[in-house]
Design a protein with these regions (language model features):
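Hydrolase active-site cap/lid region
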Residues: 118-171, 188
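N-terminal cap/lid segment of alpha/beta-hydrolase-fold proteins
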Residues: 1-26
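Alpha/beta-hydrolase active-site loop
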Residues: 76-95
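Short beta-strand/loop motif that positions the catalytic acidic residue
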Residues: 185-186, 192-194, 198
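The serine-hydrolase catalytic nucleophile loop
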Residues: 38-51
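Conserved alpha/beta-hydrolase
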Residues: 51-72
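Conserved alpha/beta-hydrolase "acid-adjacent" motif
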Residues: 199-205
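Catalytic histidine-centered segment of alpha/beta-hydrolase-like enzymes
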Residues: 225-235
Length: 269
């Protein structure tokens, strides 16, 4: 059997930013769009491994956010990046995919949640190691991230050593936070995956997203898991793929807000 051809392409966002992307054709009508974490790229080994694993069961589109890798523009840390994801969703539709899922890691998690809540157009959302709110400085790792973003020296180091170009202007208006956007995702199914050993965002962020969201939703708090792509092993990728196949195939329940007391956490073992 001839192996499908991997296609690299450049997409252009609504505000004119060129986005470097790649398409891995899959065996089904399901496309999984990967939204990477801050300072990463679809070409980084940890992201490429996940893309290839998802590709065993679905088509995959991976791309570099603005200010990252070969994409143009400057990073706005999850604000304007929803337009980057939106052009990737449009690309998947143009390729003929009938079911589209957005899977985001860390910063990419905030993007997939905000995109689904504010713009829409996807059939399922997976948030992995994402924040529930902005400006969190409760861990040493996040204090370092804020220094890199807010100071000239930090942005210089990030540009030259991590190949990530950050907008020096900051946010003129504070974007809708992830938890607020999560409340608007239903009836699209939402899966929230978070490790109890995440050194950036503790599990409270996942619970904040979960409690804000309406059904259908699911929360996996995973013992021993760290943060984002590096902590997402092949077994977890496979379980997410299975969840996506079931969640998009099954009809969505009534989107009425559930009683918070009846909300359940599913903790994979």
């Amino acid at each position: 059997m001839t192996k499908p051809v991997i296609t690299a392409t450049t997409l252009v966002t609504e505000d004119g930013v060129p986005i470097d992307a790649v398409h891995l054709p899959g065996p089904k009508d399901l496309a999984i769009i990967i939204a990477h974490g801050f300072t990463l790229s679809w070409q980084r080994p940890r992201v490429w491994r996940i893309a290839n694993r998802f590709n065993l069961a679905a088509g995959v589109i991976a791309f570099d956010f603005r200010g990252h890798g070969r994409s143009g523009g400057l990073s706005t840390l999850g604000d304007l990046e929803i337009m980057d994801l939106d052009v990737a969703v449009a690309y998947a539709r143009a390729l003929g995919y009938q079911r589209i899922a957005a899977v985001g890691f860390s910063m990419g998690s905030s993007v997939v949640v905000r995109h689904a809540g504010l713009i829409g157009g996807v059939d399922a959302v997976v948030s992995i190691s994402g924040p529930g709110r902005w400006y969190y400085r409760g861990t040493e790792r996040m204090r370092r991230v804020h220094y890199a973003v807010e100071h000239r020296l930090g942005r210089f180091v990030t540009r030259h050593y991590l190949k990530t170009r950050i907008s020096p202007e900051g946010w003129q208006l504070v974007p809708v936070p992830p938890a607020e956007a999560a409340a608007k995702i239903a009836p699209v199914p939402l899966l929230i995956v978070h490790g109890d050993q995440d050194p950036y965002f503790p599990p409270e962020h996942a619970r904040q997203l979960y409690l804000a969201a309406r059904e259908p939703k699911e929360l996996w708090l995973i013992p021993g898991m760290g943060h984002a792509e590096v902590a997402c092993g092949n077994d977890l990728v496979d379980r997410i793929t299975h969840w996506l196949d079931q969640a998009i195939r099954d009809p969505a329940p009534d989107a009425a807000a559930p009683d918070a007391a009846s909300a359940s956490e599913r903790v994979p073992t």
